[in-house]
Swiss-Prot record:
<dbReference type="GO" id="GO:0008270">
    <property type="term" value="F:zinc ion binding"/>
</dbReference>
<comment type="function">
    <text>Transcriptional activator. Activates the gene for selenocysteine tRNA (tRNAsec). In complex with HCFC1 and ZNF143, regulates the expression of several genes, including AP2S1, ESCO2, OPHN1, RBL1, UBXN8 and ZNF32. Binds to the SPH motif of small nuclear RNA (snRNA) gene promoters. Participates in efficient U6 RNA polymerase III transcription via its interaction with CHD8. In complex with HCFC1 and ZNF143, regulates the expression of several genes, including AP2S1, ESCO2, OPHN1, RBL1, UBXN8 and ZNF32.</text>
</comment>
<feature type="zinc finger region" description="C2H2-type 7">
    <location>
        <begin position="392"/>
        <end position="415"/>
    </location>
</feature>
<keyword id="KW-0007">Acetylation</keyword>
<comment type="subunit">
    <text>Interacts with CHD8. Forms a complex with HCFC1 and ZNF143.</text>
</comment>
<dbReference type="GO" id="GO:0000978">
    <property type="term" value="F:RNA polymerase II cis-regulatory region sequence-specific DNA binding"/>
</dbReference>
<keyword id="KW-0863">Zinc-finger</keyword>
<feature type="zinc finger region" description="C2H2-type 6">
    <location>
        <begin position="362"/>
        <end position="386"/>
    </location>
</feature>
<feature type="modified residue" description="N-acetylmethionine">
    <location>
        <position position="1"/>
    </location>
</feature>
<dbReference type="GO" id="GO:0005634">
    <property type="term" value="C:nucleus"/>
</dbReference>
<feature type="cross-link" description="Glycyl lysine isopeptide (Lys-Gly) (interchain with G-Cter in SUMO2)">
    <location>
        <position position="381"/>
    </location>
</feature>
<dbReference type="GO" id="GO:0000981">
    <property type="term" value="F:DNA-binding transcription factor activity, RNA polymerase II-specific"/>
</dbReference>
<keyword id="KW-0597">Phosphoprotein</keyword>
<keyword id="KW-0238">DNA-binding</keyword>
<protein>
    <recommendedName>
        <fullName>Zinc finger protein 143</fullName>
    </recommendedName>
</protein>
<dbReference type="InterPro" id="IPR036236">
    <property type="entry name" value="Znf_C2H2_sf"/>
</dbReference>
<keyword id="KW-0805">Transcription regulation</keyword>
């Protein structure tokens, strides 16, 4: 038998919103009342007194009083319904809808000592064992302990549905017990079971049995509670009852928790902070914090189950996207006429669309920087150039790096370790409020190499990999003071890929006709198409590998000469690809190689990535 009761005790409380009033703390839990063999005497349980209530069947229930402040416990009194409707009406006039599993015929009136009537629900039978259930604000069971017998799943379901009802009512300023949360003291709600006198802690294991199946065709997913099933069904129905009230937003969510997390994108609140030494990151949700902590611990609990793969991931969403590399599924299609590309993840799709729109909405807020990015993840990773932090460690030799991709390159070259490193966690890269509204078109991609140890390069080569996306190709010094431009018309003769040059100027992936390579102290590289057709020759002169002296470009049918002279000492490093070798590709910023490896890998697979794709 279940008895809902309020106890004015401030311990163990869970916060519920109060609809404009002060937040009210309500905790739902399941505890043990004390029974005595003769039924006449009552024992005290840790200073808590119990009032006997005789039920209709002759058995005895107990109403708990809080002896700390001398106030009696409050039990919501409701009138006995005269009809067979599907709701009960509280004393304040509020109608409470009963869940499907609540049968009014199982509701029993209890006459209290003051002559009023309380309601007790007998819909579920609870085993007579040592049992405690702690029901959280989101309606889930946090802890479960049983003696020799297991808790009936119907019991868990009924309690969770009751908790969900309390949560909904509480959001309107009324708790599930019908008590208005104005300036009253913080309250504690309990569900009291008549059972054994032994008390146990609530820090226990949940059974985890999934007894609630989705009935929609082709789904059949199982859930541990009716409440979770109901939330899941909203993914089929599209029901989003929780709407953001921020001016101009209007987004809606399937759960109250989803709305609460979203509101923080407007307020900028990030209450969940990483406790790791030297880490100052904070997050909007505890789930995002948990995912972030795995970057410190190395935990990857989500494994790919495809035979022969064996990769594991920090989040289930990343695993889901990864599995599509096995299945070939690409559910997100670009609707731009003539494009026809498809993507495995929604994030990559949205980033791709910005290639067509030219949008670069994410701007670096560091004074004097003002760099812009198509992807928030690029901005997120760009921030590392403004810090001295090197958070990524090599597990072989202990070297530290600013970027995951630089670490990956080091492990491949120094330790022959080709194990993939997870480079992006989409859940971390959500734009903060106020970003994403500006547009900057006609940007460029910069191809660079990484110089191991310093994460710095001295020369950048800017180009594009898709015609019509930029007005020029630029060979530019790192400080931006000197450059050589190649026009858009000349660009079309280059093709979509160029060859690679090592740091000492030696070409790696040049065409078979080595005549394009000049000698006599000068090094050159032919910019070729994917088929190996020569489109343009760019001559690079590196004298004693110390000074970068001259760069010239020779175009197909027209000859253009440009000269770049500097006395600064800067090693020569240029990169590109035509044979599928993974390279570093920099998105118009200081050396950050995250996007580089990703884009190079896609080039290797025969794709033609766009600006920031």
């Amino acid at each position: 038998m279940l008895l809902a009761q309020i106890n004015r005790d401030s311990q163990g409380m869970t916060e519920f919103p109060g609809g404009g009033m002060e937040a009210q703390h309500v905790t739902l839990c399941l505890t043990e009342a004390v029974t005595v063999a003769d039924g006449d005497n009552l024992e005290n349980m840790e200073g808590v007194s119990l009032q006997a209530v005789t039920l209709a069947d002759g058995s005895t229930a107990y109403i708990q009083h809080n002896s700390k402040d001398g106030s009696a416990a409050y039990v919501q009194h409701v009138p006995i319904p005269k009809t067979t409707g599907d709701s009960l009406r509280l004393e304040d006039g509020q109608a409470v809808q009963l869940e499907d599993s609540y049968d009014q015929s199982a509701l029993q009136a209890v006459q209290l000592e003051d002559g009023t009537t309380a309601y007790i629900h007998h819909a579920v039978q609870v085993p007579q064992s040592d049992t405690i259930l702690a029901i959280q604000a989101d309606g889930t069971v946090a802890g479960l302990h049983t003696g020799d017998a297991a808790i009936d799943p119907d019991t868990i379901s009924a309690l969770e549905q009751y908790a969900a009802k309390v949560s909904i009512d509480g959001s309107e300023g009324v708790t599930g017990s019908g008590i208005i949360g104005e300036n009253e003291q913080e309250k504690k709600m309990q569900i009291v079971l008549q059972g054994h006198a032994t008390r146990v802690t609530a820090k226990s294991q949940q059974s985890g049995e999934k007894a609630f199946r989705c009935g929609y065709d082709g789904c059949g997913k199982l859930y541990t509670t009716a409440h979770h099933l109901k939330v899941h069904e909203r993914s089929h129905t599209g029901d989003r009852p929780y709407q953001c009230e921020h001016a101009g937003c209007g987004k809606a969510f399937a759960t109250g928790y989803g709305l609460k997390s979203h509101v923080r994108t407007h307020t900028g609140e990030k209450p969940y902070r990483c406790s790791e030494d030297n880490c100052t990151k904070s997050f909007k949700t505890s789930g995002d914090l948990q995912k972030h902590i795995r970057t410190h611990t190395g935990e990857r609990p989500f494994k790919c189950h495809f035979e022969g793969c064996g990769r594991s991931f920090t989040t289930s969403n990343i695993r889901k996207v990864h599995i599509r590399t096995h299945t070939g599924e690409r559910p997100y299609y670009c609707t731009e006429p003539g494009c026809g590309r498809a993507f495995a993840s929604a994030t990559n799709y949205k980033n791709h669309v910005r290639i067509h729109t030219g949008e670069k909405p994410y701007v670096c807020t560091v004074p004097g920087c003002d760099k812009r990015f198509t992807e928030y993840s690029s901005l997120y990773k760009h921030h590392v150039v403004h810090t001295h932090s090197k958070p990524y460690n090599c597990n072989h030799c202990g070297k530290t790096y600013k970027q995951i991709s630089t670490l990956a390159m080091h492990k491949r070259t120094a330790h022959n370790d080709t194990e993939p490193i997870e480079e992006e966690q989409e859940a971390f890269f959500e734009p903060p409020p106020g970003q994403g509204e500006d547009v900057l078109k006609g940007s460029q991609i910069t191809y660079v190499t990484g110089v191991e140890g310093d994460d710095v390069v001295s020369t950048q080569v800017a180009t594009v990999t898709q015609s019509g996306l930029s007005q020029q190709v630029t060979l530019i010094s790192q400080d931006g003071t000197q450059h050589v431009n190649i026009s858009q018309a000349d660009m079309q003769a280059i093709g979509n890929t160029i060859t690679m040059v090592t740091q000492d100027g030696t070409p790696i992936t040049v065409p078979a006709h080595d005549a394009v390579i000049s000698s006599a102290g000068a090094h050159s590289v032919a910019m070729v198409t994917a088929e190996g057709t020569e489109g343009q020759q760019v001559a690079i002169v590196a004298q004693d590998l110390a000074a970068f002296h001259t760069a010239s470009s020779e175009m197909g049918h027209q000859q253009h000469s440009h000269h770049l002279v500097t006395t600064e000492t800067r090693p020569l490093t240029l990169v590109a690809t035509s044979n599928g070798t993974q390279i570093a590709v920099q998105l118009g910023e200081q050396p950050s190689l995250e996007e580089a490896i990703r884009i190079a890998s896609r080039i290797q697979q025969g794709e033609t990535p766009g600006l920031d794709d």
